[in-house]
Amino acid sequence: MWARNLMARALYDNVPECAEELAFRKGDILTVIEQNTGGLEGWWLCSLHGRQGIVPGNRVKLLIGPIQETPSGQDQPTSGLMHQTFGQQKLYQVPNPHSAPRDTIYQVPPSYQHQGIYQVPTSHGIQEQDVYQVPPSVQRSIGAANGPHLSKKVVTPVRTGQGYVYEYPSRHQKDIYDIPPSHTTQGVYDIPPSSVKVPVFSLPVGEIKPQGVYDIPPTKGLYAIPPSACRDEAGLREKEYDFPPPMRQAGRLDVRPEGVYDIPPTSTKPTGKDLHIKYNCDAPGAAELATRRHQSVLLNHAPSQLGQSPGAQNDAYDVPRGVQFLEPPAETSEKANPEERDGVYDVPLHNPPDAKGSQDVVDGMNRLSFSSTGSTRSNMSTSSTTSKESSVSASPSQDKRLLLDPDTAIERLHRLQQTLEVGVSSLMALVTTDWRCYGYMDRHINEIRTSVDKVELFVRDYLHFARGAVANASCLPELTLHNKMKRELQRVEDSHQILSQTSHDLNECSWSLNILAVNKPQNKCDDLDRFVMVAKTVPDDAKQLTTTINTNAEALFRPGPGSSHVKSGSENIMNSTEYPHAASQMPLLHPGDHKAQGLNKPLPPSLGKDQPPDCSSSDGSERSWMDDYDYVHLQGKEEFERQQKELLEKENIIKQNKLQLEHHQLSQFQLLEQEITKPVENDISKWKPSQSLPTTNSSVGAQDRQLLCFYYDQCETHYISLLNAIDALFSCVSSAQPPRIFVAHSKFVILSAHKLVFIGDTLTRQVAAQDICHKVMNSSNQLCEQLKTIVMATKMAALHYPSTTALQEMVHQVTDLSRNAQLFKRSLLEMATF
C-alpha cells in the first residue's frame, strides 16, 4: 500500500523504551518502510543509519510524499522545506480511506514552531475515525526556550559532593509521555473557543449556559459539538436536585417517602407528642414546619430521648434515630420500656468484654518494649498497673470504629499527636535541676499543675482516636496489623493509667507545697516525679502508633457508601476540637445480637472483601524482605546486627542470579554488601578524636560532646556507604534495569540508612542533656518515616513496572532520604561544636 522510499523528518528527540524502538534526534531523516506496522496503530517501521526499528508516528513528519529513488531526494536543502505548499507543511497527515482531500484535517498557522495551536477542522466526516492526539512533548516544546527538553525517561539527580541535585526541576517529570496515545481517548486536547471559525451548530445562548463555561462537552466528542444539543431545556434540568419527588409531596408525617432510607416501618406506638404533630399537620406547609421543629427538639435533647422508639421521630432525617454519636446514659437505657426498643436500628448496650478480649489485654501487660528509644523507657507502665485496670480501660473502646476517610483521619491524627507533643514539651520546660525546691515550686506551682492537667487530657483524647483505629483494624481480613497496633496502643494506655492515677493523687493532696517541695535529694519517687517520667515517654509511643496508622490509612479508614450521611449529619460535631473523640464514640451492633441478624445493611458498613490487603500484612510466599522490615523494633547492637544479616541474606540477588548478572553488576553487589556488613562501633575507648573539629562551646558537657563526636565519625562512615548505595540504585534505574535488580539495590539503600537510625537511637539513650536528646530523637524519627515511605515507593515501582511515574516517585523519595541523612549528620556536628 505504501511506497517503499517514504522519507520522514524527526520532529522531536526520541529515547527508546525497548530494544525494538529506534533512537533518533530532532531533525534526523528516517526512511519509512511501513506505516502502522504489524497492526500497531501509530507505530511506523523505519530505518536510520542502517538500523531498523519502530518509531512513534506522531514524532516524525513525512517529507514531500513518495520520493523517487534519485540522489536528489535526500540532498534537498532543509531551507526549502519552509517554502513548501500547505499540503506539505502539515504536522499530521491522516490517510483517508475514502480518498478525500487531505488538506482540511489539520490547519497549522505559519508560526507553528512557536505557537503550536491547532484550528478546528471544518470537515466533520472523518473526525471520529482518524484523529491524532497531540503528544505531551508537543505541548512541552512551547516552553523549551525556558528550560531543557523533558523526555519520557526517568530522570535521576546528579551527585555533587555529598548531595544530589537535579539538573532541572524534576517534579515536572510526573505523568510524562509513556506510550503513544490511543485515538479512543476522549477530551485530551482542549481547543480554545476563539479558534473556531465556523460554528458547527447555531444554538441559543440559553441552551449552552447550563453546560458550563467551556463549550466543550465533558463526554463524547473531541471538538465543540455538544452531544446534548438536540435535547430540550427541561431535559437538562431533570437532575437539578437529588430529592425524590415523594419528599416534596409528603403532606403527612405517617407517609414514608419512597427510597429515602431502607428501614422497615416500626410497629411501636406513637407518643402523645407525635400524635399532636400528626393530626395537626394536614397541610403540606404545616407538616414541613412541624417536621423542622420536631427535628430541632430531637437534636437539642438527643441524650434524653435515645431510648425512645424510632417511630417517634421523622424519617426525613437520613440518620436513624437509634444511632447517635454519644452513648445513652445507663439509667435511661436500663429504664427504657422494652416495647419501645424493638426498632430495627436500635443499638444494644455494650456487652462486657469476653474472656478472649480480656486475655489479650492481660497479655499486652506483659509485653516487652520495642520502642526505638526503649532503654530510656520506664518500665513502671507495665509493673504499676494491674491487668484488671488495663482491661477496664481498654475494653469499652474495642467495639467502636472511626467512620472517616483517610485524609480526614490522618489530619486529625496528626493534630492530636502534635497537641500531645506540645503539651509534654511545655511540661518538660518547667522541669529543671532544682525544680522541686520550695522557691521554684512556689513560683511555678500553678503552671506545673496546668501542664499536668493538659498532658493527661491530651493523652486521653489521643487514646480515643487510637482505639477507634485499632477497632477498624480488627475488621481487616489479616490480623497482623491489628495485633501490632494493639501492642502499640497498649503502651499508650499503660502510660495513661499511670498519668491518670498520679494526677488524681496530686489533686487529692490539693497540690500542697509542703508535700511537693523537696529541699534535699530523695531516692523515692513521688507522684509528681512518676507523672513527669511517664509523660516523657508518651510522645515516643504515640509517634510509633501514629506512624503505623499513617502508613496503613488507606486500609484502616475506608467508610462505605452508607456512612456518608452519618458524616454529613455530624460534621460539626466530628470536626470540632472540643470533641476530638466524638467519632470513636459511635457504637456498633454486636455480631451476636438477635436484632442485628435481620439487618440487610449493617451499620456502620464493614470493609468489603474487594478492599486491597493491608500494606503491613504479608502471607506465605508473597512475603518479601520489605514486609518484614520494621526498624522501630531496635533493642540493642546484637539484635540490630542479626536483623541486618537476615535482611541481607533474604532474597540475596547474588546467590540467586549469578549467571544472569553481568560482571560489573556482580562486583558492584559484592562491594555494596561488604560496606553494608560493616558494623557500627560502640566501643568509644578505641576511638581517637578528630583534630579538625572546631572549638566547642561550654554549654555542652564533656561527656556528651565526646559521644556526639564519636557517633558523628560513625555517621560519616555509614553516610558514605549510603551515598554509594544510592549511586548504584540511580545507575540501575537510568539503565532501565528490571525490578529484581533495582529492588535489590533499594535494599542496600535502606540497610545503609538503617544504620544511621540505629546511631541516632543509641545516641539518644546515652546523652545526658535533654535538649540534645530531643533533637537527635526528632532527626532519627524523620529518617524512620522516610524509610517507610521508600519501602512503599519501591513496592509501587516494582508492581507498576515499567511505569515512569512510579519509578520517578521512588527516585524522589530516595533523593529526599539523602537530604535527611545529610541533615542528620550535620546536626550531630553542630551539637558537638556549638
UniProtKB/Swiss-Prot annotation:
Keywords: Cell adhesion, Cell cycle, Cell division, Cell junction, Cell membrane, Cell projection, Cytoplasm, Cytoskeleton, Golgi apparatus, Growth regulation, Membrane, Mitosis, Nucleus, Phosphoprotein, SH3 domain, Ubl conjugation. A motif (Caspase cleavage related site) lies at residues 360-363. The modification Phosphotyrosine is found at Y92, Y164, Y166, Y177, Y189, Y214, Y223, Y317. Pfam families: CAS_C, Serine_rich, SH3_9. One of its GO terms (molecular function) is protein tyrosine kinase binding. Residues 710-834 are annotated as: Required for interaction with PLK1. CDD domains: FAT-like_NEDD9_C, Serine_rich_NEDD9, SH3_NEDD9. Residues 368-397 have a biased composition (Low complexity). Residues 332-344 have a biased composition (Basic and acidic residues). The modification Phosphothreonine is found at T804. The modification Phosphoserine is found at S296, S369, S780. SUPFAM superfamilies: SH3-domain. GO terms for cellular component: basolateral plasma membrane; cell cortex; ciliary basal body; cytoplasm; cytosol; focal adhesion; Golgi apparatus; immunological synapse. Residues 710-760 are annotated as: Divergent helix-loop-helix motif. GO terms for biological process: cell adhesion; cell division; cell migration; cell surface receptor protein tyrosine kinase signaling pathway; cilium disassembly; learning or memory; lymphocyte migration into lymphoid organs; negative regulation of cell migration. Residues 3-65 form the SH3 domain. It is found in: Cytoplasm, Cell cortex; Nucleus; Golgi apparatus; Cell projection, Lamellipodium. Residues 328-402, 584-624 are annotated as: Disordered. Contains a central domain containing multiple potential SH2-binding sites and a C-terminal domain containing a divergent helix-loop-helix (HLH) motif. The SH2-binding sites putatively bind CRKL SH2 domains. The HLH motif confers specific interaction with the HLH protein ID2. It is absolutely required for the induction of pseudohyphal growth in yeast and mediates homodimerization and heterodimerization with BCAR1/p130cas. Negatively regulates embryonic fibroblast migration. May play an important role in integrin beta-1 or B cell antigen receptor (BCR) mediated signaling in B- and T-cells. Integrin beta-1 stimulation leads to recruitment of various proteins including CRKl and SHPTP2 to the tyrosine phosphorylated form. Promotes adhesion and migration of lymphocytes; as a result required for the correct migration of lymphocytes to the spleen and other secondary lymphoid organs. Homodimer. Forms heterodimers with BCAR1/p130cas. Forms complexes with PTK2B/RAFTK, adapter protein CRKL and LYN kinase. Part of a complex composed of NEDD9, AURKA and CTTN; within the complex NEDD9 acts as a scaffold protein and is required for complex formation. Part of a ternary complex composed of SMAD3, ITCH/AIP4 and NEDD9/HEF1; within the complex NEDD9/HEF1 interacts (via N-terminus) with ITCH/AIP4; the complex mediates ubiquitination and proteasomal degradation of NEDD9/HEF1. Interacts with ID2. Interacts with CTTN (via N-terminus). Interacts with MICAL. Interacts with TXNL4/DIM1. Belongs to the CAS family. This is Enhancer of filamentation 1.
